[in-house]
């Protein structure tokens, strides 16, 4: 598990940074099939062996609302990624098509809400990204439990804004784990048990923020989707339950710490790097 301290307005850029620099998600999946757009029944299907070989980067991205699914999936497609998406009101035919493309490796990103993800079984899943952090610790367990199955390795990456930090404190207490803030610690890190939070490199975040601003403002559809998602997020925040009172106090203390602004250990060049963790 890895937790990144991110401002809410920087989350699009944070997602691009993590996909490129941490997960190293390829733009191409390596799986192709010929389509007959007029007759879907005539589509040539790839063999199971080839499709299975393309799932090593399979990543699911959890967002808070249907509007975020539409917006974020379009941002990722604009960035050149192969993306599937699911939300609650998607019709069953489209839903099945999106899931099948992800399962078979035609896409390697699946953007979903918690409600839409219920009942979906993804046998091979390498990464889970919590774009919007959970307001319920049990939901977090359910999300991250989708990866690292059957003895395989997997990662769960979470973006945590200052407003969401109290929920991370709730999670830490629920899991009974220690929290490590920043990268200056001398402690040996265990990403399977420790709650390690740190910032993303500003240089990389700025580049992806600039890309996002240029491409969203240059695309009227994306700009409209972004506006709708922002309004949806405001309603989501009003309806979500509050964290524990003590968690708000502890979260404020964490934000005030000097270590809170430090780069996450995954981005350092020492023994704590992602490569060293395998």
Q: Which sequence ranges carry the predicted segments?
A:
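Short amphipathic alpha-helical interaction elements and helix-loop-helix interfaces
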Residues: 9, 21-28, 78-82, 104-108, ...
């Amino acid at each position: 598990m890895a937790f990144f301290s991110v401002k809410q307005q920087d989350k699009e850029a944070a997602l691009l940074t993590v996909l490129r620099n941490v997960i190293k998600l390829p733009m191409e999946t390596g799986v192709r099939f010929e389509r007959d757009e007029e007759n879907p029944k005539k589509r040539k299907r790839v063999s199971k062996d080839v499709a299975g070989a393309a799932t090593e980067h399979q990543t699911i991205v959890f967002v808070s609302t249907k509007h975020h699914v539409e917006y974020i999936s379009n941002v990722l497609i604009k960035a050149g990624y192969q993306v599937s998406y699911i939300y609650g009101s998607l019709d069953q035919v489209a839903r099945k098509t999106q899931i099948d493309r992800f399962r078979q490796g035609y896409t390697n990103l699946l953007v979903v809400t918690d409600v839409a993800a219920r009942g979906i079984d993804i046998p091979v899943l390498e990464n889970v990204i919590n774009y919007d952090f959970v307001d319920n610790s049990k939901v977090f367990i359910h999300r991250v439990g989708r990866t690292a199955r059957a003895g395989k390795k997997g990662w769960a990456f979470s973006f945590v804004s200052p407003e969401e930090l109290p929920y991370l404190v709730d999670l830490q207490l629920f899991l009974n784990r220690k929290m490590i803030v920043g990268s200056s610690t001398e402690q040996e890190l265990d990403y399977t048990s420790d709650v390690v939070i740190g910032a993303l490199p500003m240089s990389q975040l700025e580049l992806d923020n600039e890309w996002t601003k240029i491409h969203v403002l240059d695309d009227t559809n994306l700009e409209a989707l972004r506006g709708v998602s922002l309004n949806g997020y405001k309603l989501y925040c009003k309806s979500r339950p509050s964290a524990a009172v003590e968690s708000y106090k502890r979260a404020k203390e964490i934000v005030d710490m000097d270590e809170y602004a430090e780069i996450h250990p995954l981005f350092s060049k020492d023994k704590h790097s992602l490569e060293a963790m395998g």
